[in-house]
From Swiss-Prot:
Keyword Methyltransferase: yes
Gene Ontology molecular function terms on file: trans-aconitate 2-methyltransferase activity
PANTHER family: TRANS-ACONITATE 2-METHYLTRANSFERASE (PTHR43861:SF1), TRANS-ACONITATE 2-METHYLTRANSFERASE-RELATED (PTHR43861)
GO cellular component: cytoplasm
Keywords on record: Cytoplasm, Methyltransferase, S-adenosyl-L-methionine, Transferase
Swiss-Prot/TrEMBL GO biological process terms: methylation
CDD domains attached to this UniProt entry: AdoMet_MTases
TM helices/strands, residue ranges: none
Protein species of origin: Rhodopseudomonas palustris (strain BisA53)
UniProt similarity note: Belongs to the methyltransferase superfamily. Tam family.
Swiss-Prot/TrEMBL catalytic activity: trans-aconitate + S-adenosyl-L-methionine = (E)-3-(methoxycarbonyl)pent-2-enedioate + S-adenosyl-L-homocysteine
Name of the protein in its database record: Trans-aconitate 2-methyltransferase
Main subcellular location: cytoplasm
Amino acid sequence: MADWSAEQYLKFEDERTRPARDLLAQVWLDDPRRVVDIGCGPGNSTELLVKRWPQAKVTGVDNSADMLRQARERLPGHNFIEANIAHWVAPVGTEVVFANAVFQWVPNHLKHMQRLLGALAPGGVLAVQMPDNLDELSHILMREVAFQEPWREQLSTAAELRDTLPKPGVYYDALRPLCSRLEIWHTVYNHALDSAAAIVEWVRGTGLRPFVDPLELPERKAYLAAYTARIAAAYPPQADGKVLLRFPRIFIVASK
């Protein structure tokens, strides 16, 4: 895929940051000294960590140059590293690894969660939030349009960049032997957006990228028009004209 766009991602900054706030509220450490925000994106989640633990050394890690550029502008003086999370190694003494909306993009992510949990300092916390929305209409319709002509051949592998998440019990069995405390919950957000077009703008920053990035501009416009029409039919307006984007997410907080 092309590099992520911080500008596109931040069009819905408040809504995207809310799950990070909810995840952070359940991290029970009061005074960690070394905190890492993996998949830090444009720094919106990193900023929460800096405010929660001003005394800590907070480092952001991401594989997108554009996201890191925005993060450095947002939090000058803080350390940001460009790295692939699948190969990144937590520094010795890391007490918190915060991973908001990133592991769903990492192949075999459960293995890497186990690896990072094992690398934490004693009593350290791995805090994870992942979208669990591949079975939502917003994503089903991406695939349906992609399977049609003229996009079928070019987008034949687009859906393979993300796998359906395992059930909570799978995470529990894999992580419980490695930790002293484990909390897992699954919730559904209903984001009130201005229109069906706003839903399309939201997913263009994340889930729609594998479907539109490979296309040239004319094909991309045609794909987006077909997708937008289906979204408009699938998400009727509420009484006030807003549309509700249903968005399931899974949360995991594990203490070593």
